[in-house]
A protein has these predicted regions:
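Short, Lys/Arg-enriched N-terminal segments with co-localized hydrophobic residues
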Residues: 1-15
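Conserved "landmark" site that anchors the functional core of diverse proteins
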Residues: 11, 102-107, 112
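Extended boundary segments
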Residues: 16-57
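Short alpha-helix capping/helix-loop boundary micro-motifs
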Residues: 28-31, 63-65, 83-87
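Compact, glycine-rich, soluble single-domain proteins
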Residues: 47-80
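C-terminal structural segments of small proteins and small subunits
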Residues: 85-106
Length: 113
């Protein structure tokens, strides 16, 4: 952290060699990995070009895939781009890969309201 600045005020230097996950809107509960994450890697969460937090990868997360940005209980909507893109089929821990093994689609299903 830069002296005199809170974590929320830090501006991201794109040349910095830190692992980053991009949160696209304040409403999202998942972010996009900007490089491969190995289990145990610490990553910065970036929103609007600023560091808003850090987390640790609980699983491997490949470049371009989604990471949970907080604990997501089963049945909770998965939100990316401020839109629901699915629903958690099981509990998802913060820092875990979010993909077809732990989410289910909600579009075009006649059994959901």
């Amino acid at each position: 952290m830069v002296a005199g600045r809170s974590l929320q005020q830090q501006v991201v230097n794109p040349m910095e060699k830190r692992v980053k996950v991009l949160k696209l809107t304040p409403h999202d509960n998942v972010g996009t990995a900007l490089q491969d994450l190995k289990k145990g890697d610490t990553f910065q969460i970036i929103l609007d070009g600023k560091v808003i937090g850090e987390d640790t990868a609980k699983t491997e997360i490949p470049f371009g895939f989604k990471a949970a940005l907080g604990n997501i209980p089963a049945g909770t909507n998965i939100v990316k781009y401020a839109h629901v893109i699915g629903r958690a089929s099981i509990d998802i821990q913060s820092g875990e890969l979010v993909h077809v093994h732990n989410i289910e689609g909600t579009r075009g299903r006649g059994d959901l309201n």
